[in-house]
Amino acid sequence: MDAVTDRSDIRAEDDLARDDKALRLRAGGRSFVAVAKALGYGRTHQANDAFNRALRRKPAGEQESLRRQELARLNILAEDVRASQQLEPDDVARRLRTVERLRVMLLAE
């Protein structure tokens, strides 16, 4: 192996470990904003992508359990958005679309 291959392997291992940490943080109740900050992602969607990559590497039974847990969180989030008295209707609609995108990504194979 040459130095470039070694660096690529290390980077891939680091990426896998970072994805796994995103999954652990989210499963532990952290928001995707908090996960992104903790892991140095520039955007929240990068933390969500990492979470989903790690989830898909888990055994089928564990994936199902993690998906149920995440869907419950997303349902609570959607309920909170709908119940908010402080958000404008456009903001409610935008946030609910975001929650729906998160659901779609979570359930994608």
Question: Can you say where each PLM-predicted feature lies in the sequence?
Answer:
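N-terminal, charge-rich alpha-helical recognition modules
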Residues: 1-72, 76, 87
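Amphipathic alpha-helical protein-protein interaction segments
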Residues: 66-109
